[in-house]
């Protein structure tokens, strides 16, 4: 295979011409499509980056809202606990006051019942003492006193006993 310089130069010119023709054809028919594909791809990448940035900002806003809601919930929980404590204290005071009032009322009722029982016992004792005194006086004196005189005598005697 002997190739001469003329053939080499001819082949070179043919290949170079074909290459230049191919470049011109690509430039005329395909270059616009190729550049538009690259531009669309660059635009899509740019839009995706913008969309990701927007999503990140939205996520930050949502995170901030969640933090605010959580803080609000904590504050509301603290308020509920404080209100419950205050209500419990009020109920405690009310129950304590009611209990104290009930104890006082029961004491007063017991004192009244004691006083009433004491008065009834004294009346009963007065009657018994009066009867015994009349019997005793009748036996000692040997005579019968009329009821009014006996009653006055007994009342004065009982009053003296009550004062003692």
UniProtKB/Swiss-Prot annotation:
One of its GO terms (molecular function) is proton-transporting ATP synthase activity, rotational mechanism. It is a single-pass membrane protein. It comes from the Bacteria. Keywords: ATP synthesis, Cell membrane, CF(0), Hydrogen ion transport, Ion transport, Membrane, Transmembrane, Transmembrane helix, Transport. It is found in: Cell membrane. Signal peptide: none annotated. The chain crosses the membrane at residues 5-25. InterPro entries: ATP_synth_B-like_membr_sf, ATP_synth_b/b'su_bac/chlpt, ATP_synth_F0_bsu_bac, ATP_synthase_B_chain. GO terms for cellular component: plasma membrane; proton-transporting ATP synthase complex. The keyword Glycosyltransferase does not apply. Its main location: membrane. F-type ATPases have 2 components, F(1) - the catalytic core - and F(0) - the membrane proton channel. F(1) has five subunits: alpha(3), beta(3), gamma(1), delta(1), epsilon(1). F(0) has three main subunits: a(1), b(2) and c(10-14). The alpha and beta chains form an alternating ring which encloses part of the gamma chain. F(1) is attached to F(0) by a central stalk formed by the gamma and epsilon chains, while a peripheral stalk is formed by the delta and b chains. F(1)F(0) ATP synthase produces ATP from ADP in the presence of a proton or sodium gradient. F-type ATPases consist of two structural domains, F(1) containing the extramembraneous catalytic core and F(0) containing the membrane proton channel, linked together by a central stalk and a peripheral stalk. During catalysis, ATP synthesis in the catalytic domain of F(1) is coupled via a rotary mechanism of the central stalk subunits to proton translocation. Belongs to the ATPase B chain family. HAMAP family: ATP_synth_b_bprime (MF_01398). NCBIfam families: ATP_synt_b (TIGR01144). This is ATP synthase subunit b. The gene is atpF.
